[in-house]
Structure formats: C-alpha cells, structure tokens
Amino acid sequence: MHMLKTGVLACAVALAGCGAITRTTYEAPQVALPAQFEHAQPSAATPAPEAWWRAFGDPRLDAWIDMALARNPDLATAGIRVRRAALQAQLAGRALLPQPGGTLSTGASRPLSGSPRSTLETSSATLSVGWELDLFDRLGAQRDAAVFEAQASEQDRQAVALSLAATTASLYWQLALANERLEFARQSLEYTRRTGELVEAQYRSGAVSSLERREARQALAEQQALLSQYTQARAELRQALNELLLGAEAPGGEPQALPTGALPAIAAGLPAELLGRRPDLRAAELRLRASLASSDAATARYYPTLSLTGSLGGSSNSLLDLLANPVTALGASMTLPFLNVGEMRLNTAIARNQHEEAVVNFRKSLYAALAETEKALSARTELASQEQAQQRVMQESAEITRLYEARYRAGQVPLRTWLDAQERSRNAQLALSALHLAQLQNQVTINKVLGGGWQTP
C-alpha cells in the first residue's frame, strides 16, 4: 500500500508540468479590414466621448437619458446578470483551492440479549481537506471560461445602456419635432383661416364665385384635420415616454423644437477600433475566448486526475475525550479517464466544432458592424446635401407663395393657384424639419455603431 501511494505521488510530480499541454493559445480571428471607412470625412475632432449625448449641449436631454438609465428595468436586469456571472466565476475559481470538510456523529448501542445490557455511547469527529491537483489545467480553463463570460455579461450591460441612451435621444427629438409641427400646424391653420376670411369677403362682394368659397373652406378643413393628426402623434410619443421612464415625469419638461445648432463632429477612426469601442463586439470576442477555454477544459477532462486527501479525527466513548487520541490519514487517488478513447475524441471534436462556430459568428458580427458604420456615415453625408437642397426648396416655395398671394389679390390668378402654393410651402417646411430629425437620429446611429460608450453618469 505504501508503495502504491509513493507511485501515485511520483506520477503527480512527473505530470505537474503538463498543464500547458491542453491549453490553446488564443489568436484573434483574421479579418480583412479596410484602412478607413469609405464615407468617413476627414476631421480633427476627438473620438466620441463615453457620454456621447452630452456633446449636444442640451441639459434637458442629459437629464432625460440619466433618468432612463437609472430607471430602466432592462438595464437593471442586465446588471443582475453581471453580478450572477461574477459569482459563478468566483465559484469556478474556488475549485482550484483545497476543499475543507468535516463530520461529527454520535450514537448509542445496547445488546438485545446477554449481559451486561448496559448502553454504550460513542462519538466521532473528522476534519478533512481534499485537493484536486490541476495537472492539465482543466479547472483553470473552466475558471477562465467563467471569467470571460462574466466580462462578456458586463459588455452586454453596456450594450443595453448604449441602446437605451440612443432610444431615449431619438424619442426626445421625435417629441421635439411633434411639438414643433403642432405649432407650425396652428400657424398654418390661422393663415388658412385668414385666407378664408378674405375669400368670404370677396364672395359677399361678388368678386369670386362659390367655387373659390368652397376651395377656401376645404383648405381650412384640411388644416384642422392635420392639426388633429399631429396632436394624436404627440400623444402617442408621450405614452412611449411614459413607458420609458416608468411613469416618472420627464425632467425639465418637453422640448418644443429641434435644436438648430451644428451637429457635433465625429471622428470615425479606423475600422479596427470597432473592436475596442462596441460593447457587443467586445462581448462576442470575450465569448470566443470563453468557448476556447471551454474547449480546452473538455479536452483536459480525459487526462489523468490526481486528488489528494487528508483528515484528522478521532472517536471516543466520551464526547469530551473525542480528540484525546487523534487519528490522521493522508491519501492520494488517480483516475484515468483517457482510457475511454472513443468518447474522448467525440467530445473533444464537438467542443472544437463549437469554438469554430463561435469564430464564424464573430467574423459575421464584425463585418455586419462595418457595414452598419459605412451605411450610417454615408447617410450622414447625403442627409447634409439633402438639407441644403431642401433649404433652397423652402425658400423658393415661400417666395412663390408670397407672389401668388399678391397676384390673387390683384385678380391675376385663381384662388386654387394660391392655395396650392401655400400647400407646397408647408410641405417644404415639414420636409426640412423631417430631414433635420433624420440628421439627429443618424448622429445617434453613428455613435451607437461606433460604440459611443457609456459610463454611469
């Protein structure tokens, strides 16, 4: 027996340096990245800050996003997942440490026949320590996989926060546009009402027919319907805000118009920087590392396992004298799971296959991120051009409306010509506002696809 224990311990010493055999060196997946985004504009601006929305210089927007981040249940749930993953990582790490144990028992016995028939009371106690020597780094690989998963969970939380901030900013500006359009609709309704009063006076004097009178009334009804539509749209946005803030009142009230200042400049940077910015890509790479560690752990399961145990205990007829004569024991055991060669090969192949799948999915996510960024940057350029063109359209339509009004008052054109000019002018103004909103939302999208970042305010 002594020779057997000595042999087992000798094997442990011989195998102690073999842990590196089963660990695979991580190499980032090779992907072909362009040197720069095709639609990136040269800029001396610094990279987007973590709290990217503060670059707009709108304290009310800052307060809205701060409240959403503080109250959102999805973000709170993500934080709970982070804490749970961290606890699981700690639990996996404890497997590398000696595991203490102990037992305490007491009992009584009495013979059923014979003499003497006195009761015999006995007690025993044992303190034990077990330690699995991680010869082939199986436990270390499992711990690393759990740590990577915990880190990935933190990136998931940051991705939720980034998306939440983007959603809040988008809703904020949609509500601003809704209020702006409502005010514009009220002004248009008043202008149309004054036009109708002019036509009504002309009709009573016989200057125009009932056709012009009905056209003026139709235009007024259309503006009243439009005002009602905008009121409904704002009510729906307010309900969405109520859900976002869980019923809390929006801090600072509602924005009444879209911001008119220049948009914050964004330095797009190199595509490779996406890996360091986007939390979803960081999470994907961390899970790639976790899958590699899990694959190594699956392989290491089929290597010999050596466990050491030690105990200190005693037994006595008297509980107080339990450890008066302690008994110690030291043992070692080795299992040889590699003898099941068929199962080992299949499970190892399955683990490697899962890692290969994770590599493919990571590459897919990266290229999708590159495409999203190119699309957003291209839209930024085109939206700026469209806004300039729409500015000219609005200016010209306003001047055309003014000229047709003068001609109508002079009796040179029919009422319908003037009313159509008014409609085109209103549509041009609305289209310009819609483009402005699209630019703001595109700015949010760019910050999001570049991993604008988030830290607890």
Where would I find each of the regions flagged by the language model?
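Small/polar, glycine/serine/threonine/aspartate-rich low-complexity segments that form flexible
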Residues: 41, 47-56, 103-128, 142, ...
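Terminal intrinsically disordered/low-complexity segments used for targeting and assembly
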Residues: 2-70, 147, 231-276, 282, ...
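Transmembrane beta-barrel architecture of outer-membrane proteins
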Residues: 61-63, 122-124, 170, 215, ...
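Membrane-embedded beta-strand positions in outer-membrane beta-barrel channels/transporters
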Residues: 65, 124-128, 172, 271, ...
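Sec/SRP-type N-terminal targeting helices
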Residues: 76-77, 93-94, 133-161, 211, ...
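Periplasmic alpha-helical coiled-coil/stalk elements that build and connect Gram-negative outer-membrane
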Residues: 139, 154-270, 379, 403-406, ...
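A short glycine-centered flexible hinge/capping loop motif at secondary-structure junctions
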Residues: 203-207, 408-412, 449, 453
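Acidic, low-complexity, intrinsically disordered peripheral segments
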Residues: 262, 377, 431-457
